[in-house]
């Protein structure tokens, strides 16, 4: 079994920054909205927009608006997360594992949790925590972006599709999720696609850019190992990594 020794006070996103990145960070801190926000969290927004200050400013403004509306802090720490939702392992990432291109690896398995069992705030708190705690990962990971492995086994459009987030964003006049949430998605591998996948992708085009849609690849489990070492992928997704998200979550300090 893999063991973890992650330190809640160690933010590796601050390590090995280039001179250009440090200069951009310094300029970004001059924006009024960035006042009192620690460098490690400002960097999450900057990396998401490749250090384009205006785009990063739009991102942080929208992100903070969502947090304000739902009364969610920046950062979110583990003890603010509903552990029951976390244990469903329907959406998560594990710090320290990368694909062959140096991207972080995230997992989605929507059928493991029913949206009606949790409030929108609980879902958003967990989602934002997953993003905020990525500040503990190295700067190189944030430069490279993320790869998502999504298993759609047993998904039901009636049980597992949640329109609350989309409705909430529209209500607040936020039409592009990439201008709300941090992170740069480089690839999405879809496993066990249902017959409803094409309608879902059509729906996704209403709030996701075509560039992102083009990065989605429907494949079998073994096909993902052309770009990800099998030892870096969890066993339940076809890899050989002897670890569960529950073990990982339980190993983290309460203020991580």
UniProtKB/Swiss-Prot annotation:
A Pfam family: CRAL_TRIO
Gene Ontology molecular-function annotations: phosphatidylinositol bisphosphate binding
InterPro entries named among the record's database cross-references: CRAL-TRIO_dom (IPR001251), CRAL-TRIO_dom_sf (IPR036865), CRAL/TRIO_N_dom_sf (IPR036273)
Domain CRAL-TRIO: 82-245
Record CDD domains: SEC14 (cd00170)
Protein name: CRAL-TRIO domain-containing protein DDB_G0278031
Species this chain originates from: Dictyostelium discoideum (Social amoeba)
């Amino acid at each position: 079994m893999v063991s973890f020794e992650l330190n809640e006070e160690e933010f590796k996103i601050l390590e090995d920054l280039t001179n250009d990145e440090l200069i951009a960070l310094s300029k970004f801190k001059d924006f009024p909205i960035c006042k009192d926000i620690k460098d490690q969290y400002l960097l999450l927004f900057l990396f998401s927009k490749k250090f384009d200050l205006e785009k990063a400013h739009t991102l942080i403004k929208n992100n903070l608006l969502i947090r304000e509306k739902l009364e969610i802090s920046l950062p979110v720490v583990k003890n603010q997360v509903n552990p029951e939702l976390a244990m469903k392992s329907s959406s998560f990432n594990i710090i320290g594992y990368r694909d062959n291109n140096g991207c972080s690896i995230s997992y989605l398995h929507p059928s493991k949790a029913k949206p009606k069992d949790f409030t929108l705030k609980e879902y958003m708190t967990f989602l934002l925590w997953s993003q905020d705690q990525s500040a503990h990962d190295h700067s190189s990971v944030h430069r490279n972006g993320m790869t998502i492995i999504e298993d759609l086994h047993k998904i039901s459009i009636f049980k597992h599709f949640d329109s609350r987030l989309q409705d909430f964003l529209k209500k607040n006049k936020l039409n592009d999720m990439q201008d709300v949430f941090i992170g740069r998605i480089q690839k999405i591998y879809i496993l066990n696609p249902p017959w409803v996948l094409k309608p879902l992708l059509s729906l996704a085009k209403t709030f996701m850019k075509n560039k992102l849609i083009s990065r989605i690849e429907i494949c079998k489990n073994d096909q993902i190992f052309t770009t990800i070492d099998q030892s870096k992928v969890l066993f339940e997704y076809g890899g050989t990594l002897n670890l569960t998200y529950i073990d990982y979550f339980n190993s983290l300090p309460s203020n991580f």
